[in-house]
Regions:
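Catalytic core of non-heme Fe(II) oxygenases with the double-stranded beta-helix
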Residues: 56-59, 63-159
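Eukaryotic intrinsically disordered, low-complexity regulatory regions
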Residues: 153-190
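Intrinsically disordered, low-complexity boundary segments flanking structured domains
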Residues: 42-53, 77, 89-90, 134-135, ...
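Signature of the catalytic double-stranded beta-helix
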Residues: 2-70, 76-79
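Intrinsically disordered, low-complexity regions
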Residues: 3, 14, 135, 168-171, ...
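Alpha-helical interaction elements in eukaryotic regulators
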Residues: 32-36, 40, 84, 131, ...
Length: 190
């Protein structure tokens, strides 16, 4: 637990820009981040209502710049502040190849091709704190990222925070509903 940063380049090779030297602000940017928080929270299985009720916010934690060969071996993020339940990485437009991201949880893995449309668009990846993730090496160019802690600022009365188990319950419910629908409709659509 805490803000300590690992410096072993066999594990992690990336430039970290001191937050005191960076300003990321403006109404448009704040609205963009709020929109990404809402969308990524929904994709993590958190309802839009709970995003508001729990006061889910993104707090800027790091500014990272990956050069050719830059990578981060599989790891889990540590809790960096009270209420933190996940991480949001917003990739700013920059030209690079490689640097795919793998996110794994309980034996399942998803690979994200981060260099697709990287020169002209923002991309983001969000994941719960109990997910293992890695950044594969940049093969050419530079990858520029803002790393945010996903934080609950208004915990519910039970002190329960969002976690991947909520998403698992949602998937299980959807699977049960799909199976029921297939049984009653003989698999027909329409």
């Amino acid at each position: 637990r805490g803000p300590a940063t690992l410096v072993d380049e066999t594990v992690r090779k990336v430039w970290q820009i001191d937050l005191s030297k960076v300003t990321v602000s403006g109404t448009d940017w704040d609205e963009t981040v709020a929109s990404i928080v809402k969308k990524s929270s929904y994709e993590l299985g958190i309802s839009n209502e709970n995003v508001v009720t729990l006061g889910i916010e993104a707090h800027l934690y790091k500014v990272l710049l990956y050069e050719k060969g830059g990578h981060f071996k599989p790891h889990k993020d540590t809790v960096k502040e009270d209420g933190m339940f996940g991480t949001l990485v917003i990739q700013l437009p920059s030209l690079f190849t490689g640097s795919d991201s793998n996110v794994s949880h309980q034996g399942q893995s998803k690979r994200f091709k981060l260099s697709k449309d990287c020169e002209t668009s923002f991309q983001y990846t969000a994941f719960y704190g109990d997910c293992e993730h890695e950044i594969l090496p940049v093969t050419d160019g530079w990858r520029f990222c803002l790393v945010y802690n996903l934080v609950v600022t208004k915990p519910n009365k039970d002190g329960v925070f969002p976690d991947s188990r909520g998403m698992e319950k949602t998937v299980t419910m959807l699977q049960a509903e799909a199976a029921k629908w297939l049984t009653t409709n003989s698999g027909r659509v329409g």
